């Protein structure tokens, strides 16, 4: 009985949340994807956030600065740190995203780069990804470290196939016997009669 009531309660709560979200969607005209910190934790997620008008932003900023700086100092350090977190959330991944975009542009403009070019491109881009090792990687940054592959592997062209000449069967068997490391097998010739060997050495 208690399980059903709990499920019904969460269902009704979810319906209320959906109604709130739908009402907010109707009011908001523009949305954008942003990195957002979840509560007081250090967990960050990439989600759709309503875009506030620049006028509203200016009003909220002016109200915050007037309320916080009567003496020229912030009223509390926690508010200042939350502002710093918001600033980092907005700008933290833009540089690495632009690096990845630049890598994709480079690989698309060079349709068939030579191996020397691809080797020279990849170390430069991997050093860009390693520049912010002072901060632990977040959920979004782990994905961005993948494009450290050479540009030749990232290119959209399919690999070219080369035609090899077939090797005669006789040479294949001799190579296999030599490579196996085992003693050579006895070979029988069809043309010559088989003569049993007698070991008369004593």
From Swiss-Prot:
Keywords: Apoptosis, Differentiation, Phosphoprotein, Wnt signaling pathway. InterPro entries: BCL7 (IPR006804). The modification Phosphoserine is found at residues 114, 118, 120, 122, 127, 148, 152. It comes from the Eukaryota. Residues 53-202 are annotated as: Disordered. One of its GO terms (cellular component) is chromatin. One of its GO terms (biological process) is positive regulation of double-strand break repair. The keyword Phosphoprotein applies. Residues 90-99 have a biased composition (Polar residues). Residues 107-123 have a biased composition (Low complexity). It holds the Pfam family BCL_N. Belongs to the BCL7 family. Positive regulator of apoptosis. Plays a role in the Wnt signaling pathway, negatively regulating the expression of Wnt signaling components CTNNB1 and HMGA1. Involved in cell cycle progression, maintenance of the nuclear structure and stem cell differentiation. May play a role in lung tumor development or progression. PANTHER family: B-CELL CLL_LYMPHOMA 7 PROTEIN FAMILY MEMBER B, BCL7 RELATED. This is B-cell CLL/lymphoma 7 protein family member B.
